[in-house]
Amino acid sequence: MAERSAPVGVMDSGVGGLSVLAEIQRLLPSESLLYVADCGHVPYGEKTPDYIRQRCRRIAEFFQAQGAKAMVLACNTATVAAVADLRERYPDWPLVGMEPAVKPAAAATRSGVVGVLATTGTLQSAKFAALLDRFANDVRVVTQPCPGLVELIETGDLGSLQLRQLLLGYVQPLLAAGCDTLILGCTHYPFLRPLLAGMVPADVAIIDTGAAVARQLKRLLAARELLADGPARDAAFWSSADPRSLENILPVLWNTSGSVQRLQL
């Protein structure tokens, strides 16, 4: 039985999961957090499901070895490929995944047209198709795969002309289709909100699922009486690539500097 003071493991293919980590820290400030950025294998969106499953299994084993009381897959593509496999392997371990916010977007739209920005892997998945079948019968959903966005966000330069032009090229067709609600279907994309705000009309809603994931984690921990009640330890970071890259980005995306350890899996 895990202890209340045990940490929560959060993983992503790279730095995108920091957007989810921030929501978890905001809602659950007493929780100690471990973060693995699988930067040596980014982007997951262009990898095969089996490849992603193998990566997630190794990271789950690492979190288990660290004594983590729960694991969050802060990556839509990893959730699609691996969450069912991990739940089968660890039936008693709280696992939280990500999925595009189709349900709240379908409820929020006024035009009846919802746009989705996501990776190719997420948009082509059976899990995403099932979400549309379940929640989007009464709206039109326009999808936009976004190759290249994750890699540019990974550099930490969120104001670059290249990033701005690429994002604009993905957003314009959605607006032209009449979308008044945009789903950010990748955990990297919330870092683009300031850019998006300058590209879309003020009445276009932008929706992501980071806060919902934090709430689900809280529910799972509370149900098992595992919510921490003491002061949290500082978040610990690992990267499967050069740690200096993540260390340089942390002040930009996490608003705090920190040391990053190299993780070879």
Swiss-Prot record:
GO terms for molecular function: glutamate racemase activity. One of its GO terms (biological process) is regulation of cell shape. It is an enzyme of class 5 (isomerase). Substrate binds at residues 12-13, 44-45, 76-77, 187-188. Its EC number is 5.1.1.3. Transmembrane segments: none annotated. The active site is at 75 (proton donor/acceptor), 186 (proton donor/acceptor). It catalyses: L-glutamate = D-glutamate. Keywords: Cell shape, Cell wall biogenesis/degradation, Isomerase, Peptidoglycan synthesis. NCBIfam families: glut_race. This is Glutamate racemase.
